[in-house]
Amino acid sequence: MSNYEDLRGAAANEEIILDDQGIPSVMVKVPLVYLDELGIGSAHTPHPAFIINDKVVPYIYVSKYINVIKNNRAYSIPNQDPANCITFDRAVEVCYNKGAGWHLMTAAEWGVLHNLITAHGLEPRGNTNNGRHHVKTYEHGVLSPQNPTNVYRTLTGTGGKAWEALGVCDIMGDVHKWVVARLVDGEIQIIPNNNAAIHKTDLGANSKAWKAILQDGSLVAPGTNGTLKFDYTGNPANATSGFHITTTVEHKQTDDGAGYGAKDFGTLTAKSGVTIPDILKALALFPNTDKTGRGFIYFRNNGERLLFRGGSCGNGGLAGEANGTFYNPRSISLVSVGLFSAYVDPALYA
């Protein structure tokens, strides 16, 4: 990887950024944007992806390509079999291993990408049907020679411009991407603003960094009365669309065999009388002006459930940059789950 320019694509917002060992990743620069500019509320407030350690940063960097892991570090480089069979904790580790500023993509960072895609009227496509797009089947990437039987991952960035949005390739499909957010017994929990970008932030199951969300958007200790939660509207069942955002779990499932919730993200609603704060829309955990057909959202409300997003090569019309899966534990390791790393210069929030 000595000729770094060979890694670059054509997008003007791409930059090559080196880790603390001088190894490059192709990154996409995302400038500061405000919530009102994205159609979220009326306040001219920075999107939370640009607030770190109570400082407003002028830009962030996200991976252009689904990452590959080399020497226990995550890299954004083209023409690679995407990293897969990786747990949440391992995904966090291989990003932190790159040095200060490097981290697993956060809920805030995915959220700003989703909302920018919406604001620009983009409709990204990707590998959603065994190496091809499920509708435009003439669009395809290069199948990975490392695929096991009946797995159809494509090499990073080989799907062409139609599989790119805002300079980011494969945000839809190929493999799901771990993102820093979770449910605990249905309660939505995040790391405030973009503080998960701070090096070695504790993202463990028992970390005090996790916060729950009230209806007014304030962040509080998990378990506080009245926080926002995913809950079924009746008895849990497999792939039921009967669920909403509420403040009290009334239909908690007792085990995974009780099923899971699944519906188009654009149809997600709140229980009558529950107010959805702008922060959920900013993080793409609740639709703002979203159309349907941009991905499904899934959940279970028993135990800790970490988030991955985007869909995979077998998800068809269920994939999309709005796709979000809250039904697996942090220990899950699948051939269809990988990651994006991200980077923010620590000098910007020191």
Each language-model region and where it sits:
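Short catalytic/ligand-binding loop motif for oxyanion handling, primarily in non-cytosolic enzymes
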Residues: 70-71, 111-114, 177, 185-188, ...
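Short low-complexity stretches enriched in small and charged residues
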Residues: 11-21, 129-134, 292-301
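Structured loops at beta-to-helix junctions and adjacent beta-edge loops in soluble globular domains
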Residues: 10, 21-22, 28-38, 63-65, ...
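Short secondary-structure boundary/capping segments
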Residues: 118-123, 183, 192-195
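Short aromatic-cysteine micro-motif
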Residues: 45-170, 201, 253-256
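C-terminal, surface-exposed recognition/capping segments
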Residues: 1-2, 143-149, 154-155, 162-165, ...
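Charged, compositionally biased non-catalytic regions
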Residues: 1-15
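Extracellular adhesion/carbohydrate-recognition regions
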Residues: 15-101, 186-250, 305
